[in-house]
Amino acid sequence: MEKSQGYLELDKSWRHNFLYPLIFQEYIYALAHEQGLNRSILLENTDHDNKYSSLIVKRLITLIHQQNHFLIFDNDSNQNPFWKHNNNLYSQTISEGFVIIVEIPFSPRFVDSLEEKKKILKSNNLRSIHSIFPFLEDQILHLNFVANILIPYPIHLEIVVQSLRYRVKDASSLHLLRFFLFTLNKSISSFSKRNQRFFLFLYNSHVYEYESTFLFLRNKTSHLRSTSSGAFLERIFFYGKIKHLIEVFANDFQAILWLFKDPFMHYVRYQGKSILASKRTSLRMNKWKYYLVNFWQCQFYVWSQPGRVSINQLSNHSLDFLGYLSSVRRNPLAVRSQMLENSFLTDNAIKKFDIIVLLISLIGSLAKAKFCNVLGHPLSKPARADSSDSDIIERFVRICRNLSHYHSGSSKKKSLYRIKYILRLSCARTLARKHKTTVRSFLKRLGSELLEEFLTEDGQVISLIFPRTSSTSWRLYRGGIWYLDITCINDLANHE
């Protein structure tokens, strides 16, 4: 942590939340462009030159100011393409550096270093995409209605700047941000495609502002979770997972599972959408629906319509998001009760949260990437002439393992086996196409080596993580397991 402070405590201005001086640091742009450096330099390499490279950045900012943007960004063929290219390059360079700087206060390692003195312990696992699904397994069974929300976009760029000023206290940085947004307004679509990280940060910061206000109101309403026998029966699957984990990590879990107060509303955001689930009635959910629309329009000047919020009952509705199809289904369960000398069986219908992977969607994603056709028949991929066989195999195996890793929480593994088959045969056809031979003869010559590369199951990986009991790893693998190190959506898993 001492090394991290060597970079982040550049001078007294940093203590006053002045980010603008960092724009003149040369290593910021090396980080942005990944020219021989990576993001770890910011926190690990303190021997780098700390002098301000003001000449470089001032030249970029000055050249942008001197250009006639109404001519440069116009699609006039008479304009010099050299100046247009340079101007876009200057803007993109500074904007990439700007994002690197503004993200520093939100860096997990930086926040941990600042809070180390306060002894504040935080779990970074909640940053994982897969952390959403254990939450749903534990909470959604007790809820009745779910609202699918399309998050609206701000109608004016100045709203984004006003939202960010609550977090960034440096006026100079905000003026530079405003300069980017308004001077690039005519070519905002092309600029956003070249620098998606810049606009993704602005979007998340804007959404965070109204989410913090909305969640504050949501946390004011809560009720005690039901302690009926039916509620405990519905949680046996979730408690079962914790029980298996306690066998391995005995010191990391509490022996007693406490009951806490349960909020009326549960909120999850993903990919420009959000889910609002509640135990209340349909009438109360519709009130929240119109409250959200008015809240967006009146408080944050965001145009929205009631049609962007759809309310459904969980018992007959499935949630399709993040590459999974989630639903609540009822399972029969017989419970034996003992009362003095008499025993009797009671039939119960408990709710279980079921998560599956849609095979059709996965095949559609593979077909879009040219690994197969729309019917799921494997195709050969064009291989570079200088690519070795091992490089081609490693590429296919990496894609296969990433998909298996991302979809490991599925309760049905047959879909993943079909995907592995498609990728394995597509790899064989790609290699056969490269060597100008048939797939049969190539597999006969290669032997079982290609097959072994694709047969590394997740269960074998879990057995390495949980070495104490093989039965524990097998139960976890059969029921699905969530990895809390996944922080981005797999491209082939993003069907929306």
Swiss-Prot record:
Principal location: plastid
Name under which the protein is recorded: Maturase K
Compartments reported by the entry: Plastid, Chloroplast
Organism: Paeonia cambessedesii
Family (UniProt): Belongs to the intron maturase 2 family. MatK subfamily.
Signal peptide start-end: none
Role summary: Usually encoded in the trnK tRNA gene intron. Probably assists in splicing its own and other chloroplast group II introns.
Superkingdom to which the source organism belongs: Eukaryota
Record's keyword terms, sorted: Chloroplast, mRNA processing, Plastid, RNA-binding, tRNA processing
GO biological process assignments: mRNA processing; RNA splicing; tRNA processing
Keyword tRNA processing: yes
GO molecular function list: RNA binding
One GO cellular component term: chloroplast
